[in-house]
């Protein structure tokens, strides 16, 4: 079962962990963006409803992380 995070700061800390492997970004037509970070034990997700916040979060992801965008 994936773990849903509420805070963007908490998500960024999770994405910077050593066991974080990749991030998937899923965009829905009604301005809902889901970020999913795969760690060794859990898949952590966060739902962002604002387009500007989603773009900011995408830019602040760690550079060494593999990012995959889904439709």
Curated annotation (Swiss-Prot):
Task: State the superkingdom.
Answer: Eukaryota
Cellular component annotations (GO), alphabetically ordered: cytosolic large ribosomal subunit
The molecular function terms in GO held by this entry are:
structural constituent of ribosome
Q: Does the keyword tRNA-binding apply?
A: no
Q: Which GO terms describe its biological process?
A: protein-RNA complex assembly; translation
Check the record and name the Pfam families matching this protein: Ribosomal_L38e (PF01781)
The keyword Ligase appears for this protein: no
Q: Which keywords accompany this UniProt record? A: Ribonucleoprotein, Ribosomal protein
The family assignment reads:
Belongs to the eukaryotic ribosomal protein eL38 family.
Protein known as: Large ribosomal subunit protein eL38
**Native source species:** Ixodes scapularis (Black-legged tick)
């Amino acid at each position: 079962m994936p773990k849903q995070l509420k805070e963007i700061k908490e998500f960024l800390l999770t994405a910077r962990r050593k066991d974080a492997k990749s991030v998937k970004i899923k965009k829905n037509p009604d301005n809902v963006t889901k970020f999913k970070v795969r760690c060794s034990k859990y898949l952590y997700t966060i739902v962002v409803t604002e387009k500007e916040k989603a773009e900011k979060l995408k830019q602040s992801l760690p550079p060494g992380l593999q990012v995959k965008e889904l439709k």
